[in-house]
Amino acid sequence: MDLMDLTPKTDIVVVAIKHPSTNEPLKNDDGSDMTITVYAPYSKEYKAVVHAIANKRIKAAQGKKSADYTMEELEAATMESLAKTTKEWNITYGGEVPKLTEAKAKEVYDKVFWIKAQVEQGVEDSLGFMKA
């Protein structure tokens, strides 16, 4: 047994977007599958984003008597993390294939809220890379 056999082979997760009611794969106008690719939680890119967000929160809490974290702040940090760890996408939104930016990713994940859950589930499923 080689320990390298028990490590992931890629630092990305490609999530095929499915219709929220029928679970059918969604297609773009060109016939390609709609996909969103994100960095995996063990990747250096993902860790850099999480560390930056945590460091920002730690710095903001320094010197304060309370380090309370509101639900709104938690939700915003989660959205920021997802937007910044989205590597690429192949989606149709608003009749076009939008350029991936952090702001556009936040917009898509907010407006088409069920996609966020699919991406999060895809990442969670990818962590089972060692299963037989």
What feature does the model see in each segment?
Residues 49-89, 93-94:
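Negatively charged, Asp/Glu-rich surface segments that serve as flexible interaction/assembly modules
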Residues 3, 46-57, 78, 82, ...:
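Generic structural signal of hydrophobic/aromatic residues within well-ordered alpha-helices
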